Amino acid sequence: MTSSPFLDPWPSKAVFVRERLGLGERPNDSYCYNSAKNSTVLQGVTFGGIPTVLLLDVSCFLFLILVFSIIRRRFWDYGRIALVSEAGSEARFQRLSSSSSGQQDFENELGCCPWLTAIFRLHDDQILEWCGEDAIHYLSFQRHIIFLLVVISFLSLCVILPVNLSGDLLGKDPYSFGRTTIANLQTDNDLLWLHTVFSVIYLFLTVGFMWHHTRSIRYKEESLVRQTLFITGLPREARKETVESHFRDAYPTCEVVDVQLCYSVAKLIYLCKERKKTEKSLTYYTNLQAKTGRRTLINPKPCGQFCCCEVQGCEREDAISYYTRMNDSLLERITAEESRVQDQPLGMAFVTFREKSMATYILKDFNACKCQGLRCKGEPQPSSYSRELCVSKWTVTFASYPEDICWKNLSIQGVRWWLQWLGINFSLFVVLFFLTTPSIIMSTMDKFNVTKPIHALNNPVISQFFPTLLLWSFSALLPSIVYYSTLLESHWTRSGENRIMVSKVYIFLIFMVLILPSLGLTSLDFFFRWLFDKTSSETSIRLECVFLPDQGAFFVNYVIASAFIGSGMELLRLPGLILYTFRMIMAKTAADRRNVKQNQAFEYEFGAMYAWMLCVFTVIMAYSITCPIIVPFGLIYILLKHMVDRHNLYFAYLPAKLEKRIHFAAVNQALAAPILCLFWLFFFSFLRLGLTAPATLFTFLVVLLTILACLLYTCFGCFKHLSPWNYKTEESASDKGSEAEAHVPPPFTPYVPRILNGLASERTALSPQQQQTYGAIRNISGTLPGQPVAQDPSGTAAYAYQES
């Protein structure tokens, strides 16, 4: 590939830096530059191109804000109608339906550009009422990160940056970005100890802020959740009465309130969703005929709304007749499927006890460690039904929240689940192995001269902004592949799904955005040479690449792009808007378009959002010592991210009900950021000072102690379920206050697919307020017995607007 005029100065800069750093002609260092010689990344320009990238990214951010304001004013119904429609579908959303007009009133009170001022005027109490506890914990986590970065920004800019500028290893050019990095200090400079000390301080600061955040996480444990056990490993032919009799005989002091077996209802869920859509469409055209006195003809083919003439195969038919026929067919299929489901138990059960202490006692009996000779786990208390129920094979845990359970995924278990998991993740590995990082994608594009016309312009504005924009775009695309692969794994709870997503997306992002580009592995040919060619002199570890003068500028530009372009795109929710547009185009009729509007609201994906934010936070912390100028831009990113998330949580997404473990998982991964900073500093000391230098030994000791502490914490976290103390519970004041109340059994259990209770004879109300949510079977038939249906004052207006 012919080198472009823009890249001609690169070799001379490489020679200059090698001489100044005293690295000589070592192949590792030349590799770092050669790998980027014909690439659009890691370019050496004035101050790393940061001023240019900052100006263009801010301009793009303002443009995205303008576009969002227009879309919100003209097309915001695609989000609002869905939120109003979802409001009355489930008990946990009834706080929305009770004040669904309050959101509109709140915006009207704010005057001009209400969504922008709402970000600053929203109180946590409003967000708690509207979005739930998980949103509060998520925003609290962001606030702790903000305060942490404020402190680190002050220390990095007021202490570390002046120390780096005091060196003269890279000259006195005020436009040189390298002067702000640790590479500007001489190896015999005692001020290098300051960096080591501050890296330890940053570690303790992070631990302190995260500990404070963890203490603030308080969940209102719903008594029904702590009273219910989830049991797997039951024989599929086990009956409800047999399970109840076993607990009555084995644990005479524990009273069973209810036992619910689980069935394979994935297909039933799909059929019921289609039926509700059909019934709504039928009601839409029935009301339209009553209003106009004319019957409506439709073309029931995909994109049929765009057919303006009748040809063979695209004939029009009466809308009421079409949807009546579809509804009758679906009702027949639902009836047949319902009777078939009763013969397909899954070998799982939810068992609810009268008191929490009873469930705790039984859980301790099944899961507590009982070392008896060579047996680590003893048998639970037996009964006359133990052999029939195969009690020794049971796995018993506390049940998750009813809203957290993905009922349709319960049928995927055992070998089938593991084979599906292995297949999905193997395919993911194969795809991502060849597209490991955005840098590799971009360097591969360079091989085909994709970016050659950009270089031919010899315009530093375009040549610096274009790579940064591409880097962010691919950084947003590749995690989406990981995200959707996690959804395909069919986890049984949303909490488990989000928890896996946090770890999976975070680890992948760290490798593709931070570690591999930092080591200079930015093209496929060099990546494979490093991976497989053990005879080449260029295959040793490229730790020198981490500390090249322009390396930090590459990540500063990435953080700037994430702050402005990333936040603007999250506010715009472009993927959701594209999906909405596609579904509206594919809709067959006006009634189908109305259904699309009512099904456009989604729950907030805390797992993916945690992972994305923690990736950028880790990049910031990893370079906070070696490249201190990155920290204030990281603070800007977290501030913008916090404001955008406050808006989206309140105005754009449905509330989610998750377990608190996902928030603790995010805290654990946040603690990895300062540890990576210590690793970076140790590599620098090892390369520049040698292994026997006091600063290197001290950093190495701190790294070892930190790793040891992490291992002990992880092992304790993994094995604490073996301890009976893990199940010790404390009664709340309300529990202690009324003994009589504690003995009142719950009127019903939500751990049951409501579809199975008289679905064939049930007729769903067809108003927009009766729209189902996502996955929980009880949602399909509306509210539970004994629960009032909250009336939505804005429902009529929304319905009228949809029909217009």
UniProtKB/Swiss-Prot annotation:
Posttranslational mods: N-Glycosylated.
Cytoplasmic face residues: 75-133, 217-415, 490-494, 586-605, 651-660, 709-804
Gene Ontology annotations of biological process type: lysosome organization; surfactant secretion
Quaternary organization: Monomer.
Gating helix: region residues: 554-585
Family: Belongs to the CSC1 (TC 1.A.17) family.
Reactions accelerated catalytically: Ca(2+)(in) = Ca(2+)(out)
Native species: Mus musculus
GO terms for cellular component: centriolar satellite; early endosome membrane; lysosomal membrane; plasma membrane
Localization of this protein: Lysosome membrane; Early endosome membrane; Cell membrane
Record keyword Phosphoprotein present: yes
Membrane topology: Multi-pass membrane protein
InterPro entries (alphabetical): Csc1-like, CSC1/OSCA1-like_7TM, CSC1/OSCA1-like_cyt, Csc1/OSCA1-like_N, Nucleotide-bd_a/b_plait_sf, RBD_domain_sf
Ranges of the Extracellular topological domain: 1-51, 167-190, 444-461, 532-553, 624-627, 689-693
Key words, A-Z: Calcium, Cell membrane, Endosome, Glycoprotein, Ion channel, Ion transport, Lysosome, Membrane, Phosphoprotein, Transmembrane, Transmembrane helix, Transport
Name under which the protein is recorded: Mechanosensitive cation channel TMEM63A
Domain of life: Eukaryota
